[in-house]
UniProtKB/Swiss-Prot annotation:
The encoding gene: DRB1
Residue numbers spanned by region Disordered: 69-88
Every DRBM domain range: 1-71, 86-155, 169-237
InterPro entries: AtDRB-like_DSRM_1 (IPR044450), dsRBD_dom (IPR014720)
Keywords: Repeat, RNA-binding
A Pfam family: dsrm
Protein name as annotated: Double-stranded RNA-binding protein 1
GO MF annotation list: double-stranded RNA binding
Taxon lineage: Eukaryota, Viridiplantae, Streptophyta, Embryophyta, Tracheophyta
Amino acid sequence: MYKSRLQELCQQRRWAPPEYTHRCAGPAHAPLFGATVSVNGVEFRTPEDAARSAKEAHNIAAKAAFDHLSSLPLPPPPPPSENQSSYKSQLQIYAQKKGKLLPSYQTIREGPGHASRFKSVVTVDGKAFESPEYFHTVKEAESAAAKLALMSLPQEASSSEQVPVQPLSYKNLLQELAQKHGFSLPVYSTTSDGSVQVPMFKSTVVFQDGSFQGEPANTKKQAEMNAARVAFQHFEDRRKNALSSTVLRGPHLGQGTVHISAGQVKIAEPVFSVPLASTATSHSATGATDRDYHSLGSTNPLPIAKSTNCADVHIQPCEFKDEKPAFPEPKTVLEVMDSSPELTPLEDAYSAPVASTSTVSSSGCGSDPLASASTVNSTGCGSVPLASASTVSSTGCGCSLLTNRVQVYPRRPDLVLPEGATVLPFSDDVWVAVSLPTLNH
């Protein structure tokens, strides 16, 4: 049959299938038929009375078309299939380098089932590109759409120099963070979503009692990397916020003073937790000279009593400047517990160590002498007496505290309070005041 041979010829030449029409002439009991066939835009007709049936007329027209078309030279061969597939491969490589979703193709079909033509629309990086014309196969249509997309996208994308730098391995960074701080290792959970051709993965990592979900990705490895990046950046931001708050919040200077008629006791709190220094100013019989010393790291001068002659130093009786009535109250001891830093003199090179603990004890408020006085070494005028504890005895001076004994400590994370100690309400961010049971003297 020439109809089948003509059909094969059209497929070889990549033409559309032939289209047939027929005509009927003559009486109804003896009709005669003629046919017309259209192949690649050219029509071939038979005479009006060429056949007694339409099928025979179609075959005669197909023979005429086949004889004419088979004598024509063959068209140039189509481009190799590998060139067509290379456009799709290049477009897929571009999307992977850019970290985008893989290209998706949508096919548009036109014409009857036996003579269909196809167009393709490819979507990449949120942009759609349609093939410029219809093709006889889906493969050709997709290749044309991919070629158009590659030509329309930025040209630098195809250059080997534009290959992005390998991103940081956030999975390794998160694991190093866990090992450094003794945390449990991160646990990843990945789910797959989307079609088989274009799979999508979502990953969630559980780390330090927190769950972090990353952006979807085309591969499981990239999805886990995205989740690890979210978790790592969360802990990095929290660490930076903690550092900035620590720098901005500094200890505030505070000073508490108890005024005494013949002496003064100061509790100074220098900047950045420089240890306290308690000073007592004494007046000797022949006169005394006060010299100022600075504690290292502090701008507050600390007055130190220094005798300039060899006479014995007599400490005058003291009384509190307080308007409260003198009722007998429990004995009160105030201690500042800390180590004393090195002191540097302002005027000369006298060496004057300062006691690390200053104690003010109360046993009387009148003219009673001090219960325990500082030891004075009068062997020479150039030496300064050392005082391990200055004790002032006073009772019933109108000064009352919650308990019998108070100690002040610098606030530290590793601070351990003595047994039975109670934190007092006037403690702050720098110092901790605690009350202790009565001392047994």
